[in-house]
């Protein structure tokens, strides 16, 4: 039986196929003979309590000039598909949440959603690390300026970041003698109206912020270390960091194995852990990336691991 796979993503016309993990997934699925269907968020809708999609058949090829083609529009229930990859990038806003409810209706009718819609809502990429606090830096989440100031006074060198950012946006390092503590706190909490996260600064960032991929609970044995540019605190590639693929360290393995079973149980089939030194800083569940960079450096088939996991789950359904 041919597997029908849908993908919800940002416009495919604007992606960089050399780096795009979603495109790598589509290539592997197509190689296996899956039928591919393309959707954007605007193509999801509900009617009469059922979730539908205005979708188009999709074919892909690794060609910088002509990497995809779309067939005629098909309007049909999302549950007509066997599996849907939810690969829409953050922001994780109310529109994203509404989309997860629609995907959950399809899940109720037997469609496998990667990642599980309820777990996408439950697992905020920064806050969810609190469930594994023994592996994280010392962390405070609050909107109160006095608590943030006290945290800074106690630990001297801290990182402040919003709970909904991506790509290193709005991440601030506050050293002991920082003259901008007040304005940084005001900015990130929107004058006390929004939560933000404070963590102790990890000097190991100079060796890279490591992206460790976990596929259906199993760690990929290689990671991508994102090394900050000169004078930068952030390793994110989007913030000018340099990527360097490397094998997992013992600490990476320990963290990934500690977190993996819970991720699998929650239906979080494709996840990116962010690890600095031996500390877990984020659990990325919405649209993790770095497949291309790791596969280019090592003999590892991450998209194959993912499709194998999907096929195993479909076989059990």
Q: Can you name each region flagged by the protein language model?
A:
Residues 22, 145-146, 153-157, 167-255, ...:
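Phosphate-binding site of ATP-dependent enzymes
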Residues 13-141:
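Conserved N-proximal alpha/beta basic substrate-recognition cap immediately N-terminal to
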Residues 3, 9, 14-18, 231, ...:
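ATP-dependent carboxylate activation and anion-phosphoryl transfer catalytic cores
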Residues 37, 113-114, 159, 197-199:
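Structural detector of well-ordered beta-strand residues that form the stable sheet scaffold
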Residues 117-120, 226-228, 276-279:
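Short glycine-enriched loops at secondary-structure junctions
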Residues 7, 85-86, 199:
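Redox-cofactor binding/interface segments in oxidoreductases and associated redox assembly factors
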Residues 30, 107, 152-153, 264:
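Anion (oxyanion) recognition and catalysis
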């Amino acid at each position: 039986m041919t597997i029908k796979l849908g993908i919800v993503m940002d416009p495919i016309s604007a992606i960089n196929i050399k780096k795009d993990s979603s495109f790598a997934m589509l290539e592997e699925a197509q190689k296996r003979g899956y039928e591919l269907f393309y959707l954007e968020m605007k193509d999801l809708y509900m009617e009469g309590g059922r979730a539908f999609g205005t979708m188009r058949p999709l074919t892909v090829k690794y060609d910088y000039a002509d990497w995809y083609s779309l067939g005629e529009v098909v309007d049909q229930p999302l549950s007509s598909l066997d599996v849907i990859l939810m690969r829409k990038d953050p922001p994780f806003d109310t529109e994203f949440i509404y989309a997860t409810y629609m995907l959950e209706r399809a899940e109720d009718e037997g469609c496998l959603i990667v990642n599980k819609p309820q777990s996408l809502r439950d697992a905020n990429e920064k806050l969810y690390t609190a469930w594994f606090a023994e592996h994280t830096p010392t962390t405070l989440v609050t909107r109160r300026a006095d608590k943030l100031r006290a945290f800074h006074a106690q630990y001297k060198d801290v990182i402040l970041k919003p709970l909904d950012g991506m790509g290193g946006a709005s991440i601030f390092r506050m050293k002991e003698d920082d003259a901008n503590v007040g304005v940084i706190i005001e900015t990130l909490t929107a004058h006390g109206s929004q939560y933000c996260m404070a963590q102790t600064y990890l000097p190991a960032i100079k060796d890279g912020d490591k992206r460790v991929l976990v596929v259906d609970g199993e760690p990929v044995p290689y990671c991508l270390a994102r090394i900050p540019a000169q004078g930068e605190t952030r390793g994110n590639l989007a913030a000018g960091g340099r990527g360097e693929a490397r094998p997992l360290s013992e600490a990476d393995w320990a963290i990934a194995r500690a977190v993996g079973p819970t991720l699998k149980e929650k239906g979080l089939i494709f996840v990116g852990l962010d690890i600095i030194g031996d500390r877990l800083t984020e659990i990325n569940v919405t649209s993790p990336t770095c497949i291309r960079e790791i596969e280019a450096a090592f003999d590892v088939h991450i998209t194959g691991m993912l499709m194998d996991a999907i096929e195993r789950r479909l076989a059990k359904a």
